[in-house]
Structures are given as structure tokens and as C-alpha cells.
Design a protein with these regions (language model features):
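Short alpha-helical "patches" and their helix-cap loops
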Residues: 9-14, 65-77, 101-105, 137-155
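Acidic/His-rich, divalent-metal-binding segments that scaffold phosphate/diphosphate chemistry
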Residues: 1-84, 91, 113-122, 131
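Beta-strand segments within the central parallel beta-sheet cores of soluble alpha/beta enzyme folds
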Residues: 42-46, 100-105
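A short structural micro-motif
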Residues: 1-2, 108-111, 170
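Divalent metal-dependent phosphate-bond-processing catalytic cores, especially two-metal-ion Mg2+/Mn2+ enzymes
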Residues: 34, 89-101, 113-180
Length: 180
């Protein structure tokens, strides 16, 4: 994709998908390793693929109607549909159902979802929200309870936020490895 000149108009969006996916994957990997001591690769895979639906929609819009992206409703449609489309793609690829379900429910924290969801889903949703809070400061205004929501996520050996705090070196190392 990096060499395809026909993607010029959406290149910044594609680069953002790649960067976000890598950063969320690094958080998922390091926290899963700390929380569960097992399956960090599965958590990393969920993080890497959580935006596959966004990638599909962006490519489809670019190839079929590039003006679609100027429609004011496009951003909301993209946010609403990307987890559903992502799950469908991952199921078609035969990925484990836990990963597919986590991708579908990646926004459960902000959507007021249940704390009874699978640990991988809670982890992915928390990692995505934490990343968004770092790169979208306005999100704190839209969701003043976002920090509280993150603090309420418990995984294995502790709270998500405590696990992130003790995993900072692993997160940074994994982000660097994925970005290379």
C-alpha cells in the first residue's frame, strides 16, 4: 500500500489506521502478558486487526466514490460500521471467535457495555479508549467519565490502569518493534 500512488487521497487515513493499530496492539500485548501471563500474541492480534473494518470502508469508498468521504455523515457511518465489518472480515478469515468478538465490541466501554464480556474484549476496548484519550483530547469533554471507565476494567491480576502503569517499558518496546 505504501507504494500505490492511486491511494494518495487516503494515504493519511491509511497511515493513521496503521499507527493506531500498532499502538493499540502494543498496549494489548503488554497488558495481556502482565495480566494473564499467557496469550499476549492473541491480544496483540486483536489490537492489530481492530481497525480492519475501517480499512475496508476507506478502500471501498476511495475505489467506488471518493466524494463519499466529504459527506458529513461519513465519519459517523465509519465509526458505527467498522467494528461490524471488521468482525465479518475476521470471521471469513477463520480467526478465533474471541478475536472476532473483541473487534466487534471494541467500543463497549464508551457504549456503556457490560463488564461481563470476555477479558480479551475488555482489554481491547480499554486499550483503544486509552489510546484515543491520548490522541483525541476532546474525547474527555465528550466523555468526562472516560478515565473512570478505564479504571473500572479489571483483568486477571489487577485493574487495566495499574497493569498499564507497570507495563510502560513493554508497551514502548512493542510500539517500537511494530513501527519498524
Amino acid at each position: 500500500l505504501s507504494r500505490d500512488t492511486s491511494l494518495g487521497a487516503i494515504r493519511p487515513d491509511l497511515e493513521q489506521v496503521w499507527k493506531t493499530s500498532n499502538e493499540v496492539a502494543a498496549i494489548c500485548y503488554a497488558v495481556a502478558k502482565q495480566a494473564f501471563g499467557r496469550q499476549p500474541d492473541e491480544a496483540m492480534m486483536a489490537g492489530l486487526l481492530h481497525s480492519i473494518g475501517r480499512l475496508y470502508i476507506l478502500m471501498h469508498a476511495h475505489q467506488n466514490d471518493p466524494t463519499m468521504r466529504q459527506d458529513p455523515a461519513f465519519a459517523e457511518t465509519l465509526e458505527t460500521w467498522q467494528p461490524i465489518i471488521g468482525k465479518a472480515i475476521l470471521e471469513a478469515w477463520g480467526l478465533p471467535q474471541r478475536i472476532c468478538d473483541a473487534v466487534e465490541n471494541q467500543d463497549y466501554l464508551l457504549d456503556g457495555g457490560s463488564a461481563e464480556l470476555e477479558p480479551l474484549t475488555r482489554l481491547l476496548s480499554a486499550a483503544k479508549l486509552r489510546h484515543r484519550l491520548e490522541v483525541e483530547p476532546e474525547l474527555r469533554l465528550q466523555h468526562p467519565d472516560a478515565e473512570f471507565l478505564l479504571g473500572s476494567v479489571n483483568l486477571g491480576k489487577g485493574s487495566f490502569m495499574d497493569l498499564v502503569a507497570v507495563s510502560q517499558a513493554d508497551i514502548a518496546s512493542m510500539q517500537q518493534a511494530l513501527a519498524a
